[in-house]
């Protein structure tokens, strides 16, 4: 295997980190222990998979000499074992190639999820609410926490806009390919002629930035407070608990009124603002990359039409990878694994292809 030397080094590093986690000096230092545990965790899958490969390789090394045996029964046993182990070895090597791909540094981050109704009027707001419900259900299946920071309802009970913080394990890794335009094709409840209409919403998934990555300077922000309001604009309380933060250098504005506490609303608004500023920096970096590299990592362009939900045909189609599922009812209930897994595998294959063109992993 071309990259066995690389894997030997990573396995050795994994063992070193495992030993450090048992070191009393490391255990007594919470920050240091957290860093070591994180580094060890990042290598655990690779180390386990490499050991699995070595076990298979040992089995093959023992079976191959038996092909020279005069005993027909022993020879047949060796042939059967090799026939079983060779495909297993190839499968593990493919999995190792995926594990060795450069990691997206944002994959472990929480996200800011933004959904906005686009073309289609009231129907678009109803669809925005349904898509938000879809993601909420999916978050439940993943044991993620979803917190709404702000939302704007339409007169028909839909959502003009909703912004939420999603926290948990590998949130960005699983939701990062959701950014873009989502179209719905169906007969609206207000349609008298039974004609199918097309409406659209936009989804943005931003990796959440922490205070170290994006520092908010007091001189750069203006904070306004106001009374929270419900649907139709009516006041829902008499205290100035809602918060609006304006980032003066960029003009970005973030509001939060979901909590009754002004302090909690401000904290949530700051999390969203940091993530938007982080996204601006990521966009600058993306612009500096070549077009081919941007394709490999997935553009995340909000104007890109990525998916169509056709209700009459119970069909959902992802246009980027040519995926069509006639299980729209399941998907809308938050059963998104088939789509998420297919997108992940597609972009992993793209990266593997790019890696192969560069040459073997050193």
From Swiss-Prot:
Subcellular location: Cytoplasm
Database matches in InterPro entries: PCRF, Pep_chain_release_fac_I, Pep_chain_release_fac_I_sf, Prokaryotic/Mito_RF, RF-1
N5-methylglutamine PTM sites in chain numbering: 234
Single GO term (MF): translation release factor activity, codon specific
Keywords noted in UniProt: Cytoplasm, Methylation, Protein biosynthesis
Disulphide connectivity of cysteines: none
Stored SUPFAM superfamilies: Release factor
Primary location group: cytoplasm
PTM comment: Methylated by PrmC. Methylation increases the termination efficiency of RF1.
Pfam families in the record: PCRF, RF-1
Example of a GO cellular component annotation carried by this entry: cytoplasm
Role, per record: Peptide chain release factor 1 directs the termination of translation in response to the peptide chain termination codons UAG and UAA.
Family statement drawn from the similarity comment of this UniProt entry: Belongs to the prokaryotic/mitochondrial release factor family.
Matching HAMAP family: Rel_fac_1 (MF_00093)
Name of the protein: Peptide chain release factor 1
Species assigned in the record: Solibacter usitatus (strain Ellin6076)
Organism taxonomic ancestry: Bacteria, Pseudomonadati, Acidobacteriota, Terriglobia, Bryobacterales
């Amino acid at each position: 295997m071309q990259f066995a030397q690389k894997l030997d080094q990573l396995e050795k590093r994994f063992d070193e980190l495992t030993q450090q986690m048992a070191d009393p000096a490391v255990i007594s230092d919470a920050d240091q222990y957290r860093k070591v545990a994180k580094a060890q965790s990042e290598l655990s899958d690779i180390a386990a998979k490499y050991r699995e490969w070595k076990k298979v390789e040992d089995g093959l090394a023992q079976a191959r000499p038996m092909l020279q045996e005069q005993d027909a029964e022993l020879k047949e046993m060796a042939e059967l074992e090799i026939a079983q182990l060779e495909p297993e070895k190839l499968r593990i090597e493919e999995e190792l190639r995926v594990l060795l791909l450069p990691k997206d540094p944002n994959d472990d981050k929480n996200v800011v999820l933004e959904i906005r109704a686009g073309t289609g009027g009231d129907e678009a707001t109803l669809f925005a609410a349904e898509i938000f419900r879809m993601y909420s259900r999916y978050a439940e299946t993943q044991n993620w926490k979803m917190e709404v920071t702000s939302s704007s309802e339409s007169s028909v009970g839909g959502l003009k806009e909703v912004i939420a913080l999603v926290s948990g394990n590998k949130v960005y890794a699983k939701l990062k390919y959701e950014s873009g335009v989502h179209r719905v094709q169906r007969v609206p409840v207000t349609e008298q002629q039974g004609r199918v209409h097309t409406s659209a919403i936009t989804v943005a998934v931003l990796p959440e930035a922490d205070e170290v990555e994006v520092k908010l300077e007091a001189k750069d922000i203006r904070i306004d407070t106001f009374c929270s309001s419900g649907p139709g604009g009516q006041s829902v309380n008499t205290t100035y608990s809602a918060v609006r933060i304006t980032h003066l250098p960029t003009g970005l504005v973030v509001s939060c009124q979901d909590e009754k506490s002004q302090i909690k609303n401000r904290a949530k608004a700051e999390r969203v603002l940091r993530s938007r500023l982080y996204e601006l920096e990521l966009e600058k970096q993306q612009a500096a990359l070549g077009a081919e590299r941007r394709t490999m990592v997935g553009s995340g362009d909000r104007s890109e039409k990525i998916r169509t939900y056709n209700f009459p045909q119970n069909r959902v189609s992802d246009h980027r990878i040519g995926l069509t599922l006639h299980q729209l009812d399941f998907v809308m209930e938050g059963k998104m694994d088939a789509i998420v897994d297919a997108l992940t595998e597609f972009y992993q294959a793209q990266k593997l292809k790019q890696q192969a063109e560069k040459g073997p992993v050193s």
